């Protein structure tokens, strides 16, 4: 993969633009997925009174929450990989 990136680095304006477009799409998707997730805290009143239930209660994520959590992890990893590739091509 490093050889491929160094090959593209020499004449890779198209690849650089393509990776930037992928990064923008990934950023928009990551922001959307994070905003779709349910809040895990009750705000300030939950921190004062009802925080023990969240701390000691074990609730597993199911369904949509689990899917959004995993999708957030995947999109975050993709974000960092794209950033590393773009910075390598920019050298």
From Swiss-Prot:
One of its GO terms (biological process) is protein transport by the Sec complex. The keyword Zinc does not apply. The keyword Plastid does not apply. It holds the Pfam family SecG. One of its GO terms (cellular component) is plasma membrane. Keywords: Cell membrane, Membrane, Protein transport, Translocation, Transmembrane, Transmembrane helix, Transport. Its main location: membrane. Disruption phenotype: Grows normally, a double secG/secY2 mutant enters stationary phase earlier. Significant differences in the export pattern of a number of extracellular proteins are seen in a secG deletion; the double secG/secY2 mutant exacerbates this effect (shown in RN4220). Single or double deletions are as virulent as wild-type (shown in RN4220 and SH1000). GO terms for molecular function: protein-transporting ATPase activity. It is found in: Cell membrane. The chain crosses the membrane at residues 16-36, 71-91. It is a multi-pass membrane protein. InterPro entries: SecG. Belongs to the SecG family. Component of the Sec protein translocase complex. Heterotrimer consisting of SecY, SecE and SecG subunits. The heterotrimers can form oligomers, although 1 heterotrimer is thought to be able to translocate proteins. Interacts with SecDF, and other proteins may be involved. The channel interacts with SecA via subunit SecY. Also part of the accessory SecA2/SecY2 protein translocation apparatus required to export cell wall protein GspB. Subunit of the protein translocation channel SecYEG. While not essential, it considerably increases the export efficiency of extracellular proteins. This is Protein translocase subunit SecG. It comes from Staphylococcus aureus (strain NCTC 8325 / PS 47). The lineage of its organism: Bacteria, Bacillati, Bacillota, Bacilli, Bacillales.
